[in-house]
Regions:
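Partner-binding and oligomerization surfaces adjacent to conserved cores of proteins
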Residues: 1-318
């Protein structure tokens, strides 16, 4: 099911400064996944990958040993290395850590939303857990039309050099049914890559399955970026995951075939430079914002009045 069929509207929570920037510049910031508030959440998928990779490593390792002309010597080496199972465990862990290390360095870039709630009060007033995160400064929720957002993403992809853009729901760690439905088909694309990597290790030669791994790794990076701890399930999070094309992916094309490269921008946060991209900035089109919810604040009515002045002449409701 498409996100737009499940959620007619998406909620993006932000500060006053963030809201003004979004309205004035007609764009949304997507932050590099390594600089999210909790990057460690991207490691949640590791155990699932080990479950996927271990039987493949075991099978390929067994084939290598059984087919080796000096099988007895190889088995002796394995036995002195704590045994076959321990070697498989070690190689599986090394392989999975290597997969994380080789995720494309320039992406994905992520923008987060909350999907509609089954509780109409929350849809009308915003989510309390989100408002708490803004403390005394208060916050705002921009309510987007999901279908129109999807159409704008298609235009963004067609106009600029991306390898992939998607708008999809987060999968939470206690939802095995959705994991199997959404992630297993994608992660299965890694099977050929894993088999090729093990053959590389055993035979010392580059396997074609390893050379042609871009799509498999893009699927892995997408799953990694959309898998989240069950403790956040209330948020019904939906994410834009954008993969700007990197130069190597465009080599070999004539200049006339190249789309303009997506500009990367940086902002300072806690003394560090954080890379991000500005989605929709070059489309010269208003964002599909239907209304803005003003969060709890001691001067809430004044904020509502200020917003109405700012949005005069637009169709955005407050």
């Amino acid at each position: 099911m498409k996100v737009s069929e499940r959620y007619k509207r998406l909620y993006h929570y932000t500060t006053w400064g963030g809201l003004v920037g979004i309205i004035e510049n007609r764009c949304l910031w997507a932050t590099h996944h390594r600089f999210l508030n909790d990057y460690s959440e991207t490691l949640l998928l590791k155990d699932k990958l080990i479950e996927l990779a271990k039987p493949i490593v075991q099978e390929e390792s067994r084939k290598f040993v059984d087919g080796h002309p000096d099988q007895r010597r190889i088995m002796k080496i394995i036995e002195t290395s704590s045994g076959f199972d321990a070697v498989v465990d070690h190689n599986t862990d090394v392989l999975v850590r290597g997969m994380y290390a080789t995720v494309p360095s320039d992406g994905p870039y992520i923008t987060s939303f909350c999907g509609e709630s089954k509780d109409e009060y929350i849809n009308a007033n915003g989510m309390l857990s989100q408002w708490r995160g803004y403390g005394q400064d208060g916050g705002f929720a921009l309510v987007f039309d999901t279908q129109r957002m999807g159409c704008m993403l298609v235009k963004e992809y067609e106009r600029l050099a991306y390898s992939h853009i998607e708008l999809d729901r987060v999968v939470y760690s206690n939802d095995e049914e959705r994991f199997k439905e959404e992630f297993e088909p994608r992660l299965s694309n890694l099977r050929g890559f894993i088999e090729g990597m093990i053959r590389c290790i055993h035979e010392g030669a580059l396997d074609p399955m390893v050379q042609n791994h871009e799509n498999a790794f893009r699927d892995f990076a997408s799953c990694m970026s959309r898998y989240k701890h069950r403790g956040f399930k209330e948020e019904n999070e939906v994410r834009i995951c954008a993969f700007p094309a990197i130069r190597d992916e465009k080599d070999g094309l004539d200049k006339d075939q190249l789309k303009p490269e997506k500009e990367r921008t940086f902002r300072t946060k806690n003394g560090e430079q954080v890379p991000y991209i500005e989605l929709f900035k070059t489309l010269d089109q208003d964002l599909p914002i239907e209304r803005i919810i003003v969060g709890p604040h001691q001067n809430k009515e004044a904020r509502v009045s200020a917003l109405r002045v700012m949005l005069h002449g637009t169709s955005i409701k407050v």
